Amino acid sequence: MNIRLYAVKSDRPLSEAERSTLARFLPPERQDRIKTSEPLCAYALLCRALHELYGLEDLPQLSYGEHGKPYFASHPDVHFSLSHTRGAALLAVHNEPIGADIECLRPVSGAMRTRFHAANDADFWRLWVQRESRCKRAGISAVALRDREVPSFPNERVFALEPFPDYTAGVCTCSDADIDKPIYLTVKELI
């Protein structure tokens, strides 16, 4: 199976009706905590992908790894990584561990650029999503590694993507699978 990517971008705030409709995709333990549009869209992407790829009608019960990485204990062959940022969400799905991160390009401090050896803001965010996707694939807390390098893993590959103008993303895998062309959806299509 190739790595499947799903992405959504919203250029406007969601209406209350849209929020309510998207909230039905949230796992029960997150329904009281998640109120912003980006994570709502991320879980809607996950539900859609699970239905399209595996025929699952409902979101399986989530379990969480030592550092909070979500997984489906009832479906150990389904691996996914959710990411969201200002106005966008990204999902990667595969049959092996996968990590994905998306960020909106925005200004960062000179100190942060220096720390990551980044020439400019866009370069910083490209390096950042690569680091985050590697951590997410491995199930490692990026916060715990704040001042250290992310360990390397055999056969690790990181793909750089520009899913939307002014956004950058990274997808990490240790498999030899290719990435399918991302499936871009609108909020209306998710509802």
What is the predicted function of each stretch?
Residues 1-191:
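Core catalytic alpha/beta fold that binds nucleotide/phospho-ligands
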